């Protein structure tokens, strides 16, 4: 916001005041990942592994069929944004697996 000047007219008329900054509302944190949620999801992923559609999508990503993988995942999860997020997650998993394999050798 513009600096106010003690003027009687114009856009900046009025008394100089400091803006009262309010805390963001609690409802704004919906969907944010907490440490506990991340821990639980990682634990479940470790125990259960990947779903069959995720394994197939990872195979498509391995052979650089990114667009085909996106279309395939979209068909399974329903929306484009969720599909993009899932594809990103699976490609990160593949990258981590490659990194671990390179480190082991």
From Swiss-Prot:
Name one molecular function that GO assigns to this entry. Answer: structural constituent of ribosome
Q: Which GO terms describe its cellular component?
A: cytosolic large ribosomal subunit
Q: One biological-process term from Gene Ontology?
A: cytoplasmic translation
Primary location recorded for the protein, binned into one broad class: cytoplasm
What's the subunit arrangement here? Component of the large ribosomal subunit.
What is the role of this chain?
Answer: Component of the large ribosomal subunit. The ribosome is a large ribonucleoprotein complex responsible for the synthesis of proteins in the cell.
- Quote the Gene3D superfamilies the UniProt record gives: 60S ribosomal protein L36
Keyword list (alphabetical) reads: Cytoplasm, Ribonucleoprotein, Ribosomal protein
The record's comment on protein family reads: Belongs to the eukaryotic ribosomal protein eL36 family.
Q: What is this protein called?
A: Large ribosomal subunit protein eL36
The record lists the lineage as: Eukaryota, Metazoa, Chordata, Craniata, Vertebrata
Instruction: Specify one Pfam family.
Output: Ribosomal_L36e
Cross-referenced InterPro entries: Ribosomal_eL36 (IPR000509), Ribosomal_eL36_sf (IPR038097)
Q: Which compartment or compartments is the protein found in?
A: Cytoplasm, Cytosol; Cytoplasm
Q: Read off the PANTHER family from this record.
A: 60S RIBOSOMAL PROTEIN L36 (PTHR10114)
């Amino acid at each position: 916001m513009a600096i106010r000047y003690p003027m009687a007219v114009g856009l900046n008329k009025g008394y100089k005041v400091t803006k009262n900054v309010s805390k963001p509302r609690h409802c704004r944190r919906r969907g944010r990942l907490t440490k506990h949620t991340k821990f639980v999801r990682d634990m479940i992923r470790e125990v259960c592994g990947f779903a069959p559609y995720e394994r197939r999508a990872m195979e498509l990503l391995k052979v650089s069929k990114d667009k085909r993988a996106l279309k395939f995942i979209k068909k399974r999860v329903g929306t484009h944004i969720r599909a993009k997020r899932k594809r990103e997650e699976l490609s990160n998993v593949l990258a981590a697996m490659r990194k671990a394999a390179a480190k082991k050798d």
